[in-house]
Amino acid sequence: MTRSEKTRHFGNQNYEKLRKICIKKKQPFVDTLFPPTNQSLFLEQRQSSDIVWKRPGELHPDPHLFVEGASPNDVTQGILGNCWFVSACSALTHNFKLLAQVIPDADDQEWSTKHAYAGIFRFRFWRFGKWVEVVIDDLLPTRDGKLLFARSKTPNEFWSALLEKAFAKLYGCYENLVGGHLSDALQDVSGGVAETLHVRKFLKDDPNDTELKLFNDLKTAFDKGALVVAAIAARTKEEIEESLDCGLVKGHAYAVSAVCTIDVTNPNERSFTSFIMGSKRKQNLIRLQNPWGEKEWNGAWSDDSPEWQNVSASQLSTMGVQPANSDSDDGDFWMPWESFVHYFTDISLCQLFNTSVFSFSRSYDEQIVFSEWTTNGKKSGAPDDRAGGCHNFKATFCNNPQYIFDIPSPNCSVMFALIQNDPSEGLKKREPFVTIGMHVMKVENNRQYRVHTAMHPIAISDYASGRSVYLHLQSLPRGRYLLIPTTFAPKEQTLFMLRVYSDEHIHFSPLTKHAPKLGLLKCKSAQSVTRLTIHGVDFNSASTGTHNVYAILKDSRKSFRTKTLSGVKSIQWDEQFLFHKSKNRQQYKIEVWEDRKMARDHLLAQSVIIALIDNENRDTTLQLTDPRGTVIGTVSVTVSAFDDPMYL
């Protein structure tokens, strides 16, 4: 597992070196990799003589990168259909630490008498595990003396226009910014874990996932610095940018700038009794920013809505909640949560996990893997093939890369973020992403070798033909699990990055070997594989009180233990163990123990299993005898034994 935080220079352009050259020559920088011509605007060669490239100093006598800091109003969409990026930039203004990462050394880049002007700027975007520094000149496309694309409402502030230009360079040209993915833009400007929630699906899949839970989850993520953008999906091309009666726009993205709960006084209950007893109710609100800088929600809790009269000025001031300016249609508005989930269909958020061990707030364990789906030049399904496709392709599915991890406790939460490499960085021609996803299954407690026959999945991510997919696992039983990242179809080859975040450390490692070598010198090949499933025990009569019981499974060399469970007469484990052998007849011993905590553990009973390699799955019930030889119950077991060591 490797991780590199070193910044990569896009096009091998070094900002410091180029800036020194420009200052020495007393000439402002002109970027030859992204020239101020139609070549940088369009996918194909076009004539557009009315577009003039101008530097900020030609557009305003007192240009600045920032004017009084950054705010959502600094980012207003131009004629380019790139609300996905503009909304992400608007969301970025709520996380100053990230903004400083994307726009490094802003003070040194600012127009100032303290240092020479060189017409060169740098920005950073997160790509495939590294921050990529993109250098640009400050020549911006204009028409009739006005910026064509992103701009600030403050006429002499230019950070948003310059940031958009750097992003266009990363994507090959400005036209490539039309109609992108919200989650990609959020990830590019944050390096966080991107996830898109489909509101209807989220509320429908699990009846326990209510609107309130979604609100609380979103508020928690936002308060921790997550970047959040919401959108209303358009079903057809004709519906894109269609305005609804409520003021919202279909096929359009809005940056989320606040998520909060306020107290609202009931205007009909303002008597002395209600004052003493309390007549307030809670109202969940969300604040959004339209990148157009206009067109707002006009329903309850909109700018000039009467609902604001029922909220005290002191509460608004204390909570930092202020109704948007009712005197202008600036694209900034509040709306009630219940209306938000009614109209908005998708929520894209990019979470930033705290991985510092010195933090007082909750921190996460982070593990990162770089690998690839590749056939290794082999036929599909060959042992070294690592591009097997999804579970639909059963013959090759298990050929994919495999990663094993242990859940140490039932309260452990694990998040997986799978990202594929973008081969089109900086190119006009965009190669389509392959469809990717993740598949998780529970495996034997002692498995150390690759799975060859898929077991029942306990979780499957959405499959998406985008840059990344996300999977969150909660409340899994303690045990060993296998993660298989896949493309949808076999033989699809590309690099991928896998990030794992957990609130407890989990041992996460790749499985590369098919079977062990046996014998003293480790030179014998395994001839068979056996899976033993210990389901549970039933005692003939209930003893007094509840006992904590576990089982130990032994072969001639090793022993393995189940978890400890409490019970009176019956104990159910349903735990599996795997054995590779060089003999066709195998013997195993099962011991049932009482976990006495404060004293030495007590052997309750034992039994012996004779496993024949018969290529069958056999359920069997064995008698349990205590140390004196008395039968005191039974243990139920499934024996799956095969003469192909690479069968299971």
UniProtKB/Swiss-Prot annotation:
One of its GO terms (cellular component) is membrane. It holds the Pfam family Peptidase_C2. The active site is at C83, H252, N290. Residues 502-625 form the C2 domain. Disruption phenotype: RNAi-mediated knockdown prevents neuronal degeneration in a mec-4(u231), deg-1(u38) or gsa-1 gain-of-function mutant background. Residues 354-509 are annotated as: Domain III. Keywords: Autocatalytic cleavage, Calcium, Differentiation, Hydrolase, Necrosis, Protease, Sexual differentiation, Thiol protease. InterPro entries: C2_Calpain (IPR033884), C2_dom (IPR000008), C2_domain_sf (IPR035892), C2_III (IPR033883), Calpain_cysteine_protease (IPR022684), Calpain_domain_III (IPR022682), Calpain_III (IPR022683), Calpain_III_sf (IPR036213). Expressed in neuronal, but not in GABA-ergic neurons, intestinal, hypodermal and excretory tissues. Binds 3 Ca(2+) ions. Its EC number is 3.4.22.-. Residues 28-353 form the Calpain catalytic domain. One of its GO terms (molecular function) is cysteine-type endopeptidase activity. It is an enzyme of class 3 (hydrolase). One of its GO terms (biological process) is protein autoprocessing. Its cofactor is Ca(2+). Required for the correct female sexual development of the soma and germline in hermaphrodite animals, while being fully dispensable in males. Has calcium-dependent proteolytic activity and is involved in the cleavage of tra-2, for which it acts as a potentiator. Capable of calcium-dependent autolysis. Part of the necrosis cell death pathway. Required for necrosis of intestinal cells induced by B.thuringiensis endotoxin Cry6Aa. The calpain catalytic domain is essential for in vivo function to promote female sexual development. Belongs to the peptidase C2 family. This is Calpain-5. It comes from Caenorhabditis elegans. The gene is tra-3.
